[in-house]
Amino acid sequence: MLWEILVPRKWNNGRPVRTRHHRVFDAKVRDICGGLTIHPPTIKGEWISTEGTLYIDSTIPVRVSCTREQIEQIMDFTAKHYKQKAVLAYKVSDEVIVKNYPEN
């Protein structure tokens, strides 16, 4: 399956997340499922927490080919790593084809 998860560009206090912090996320995702595709940070969203707080986010869409269990593991890590109250991921496709060409 192909999943997309939205990773925050800023902390809840509005300060930008540093590149080196994102690199730790990238390495963890590679460890879990073998790779990731990072898209340009163009997604802006708004949501209301269970406590009634409005959050306005700018996020980085990250796509991963993995199982349901792996995306949930990635979501759990994302919540802890970025100190998030909620994490959004959604299935993009049920079918993913990867062809390897070792001779190239």
Residue ranges and their predicted role:
Residues 1-104:
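Positively charged, small/polar-rich N-terminal and surface patches that mediate targeting and assembly
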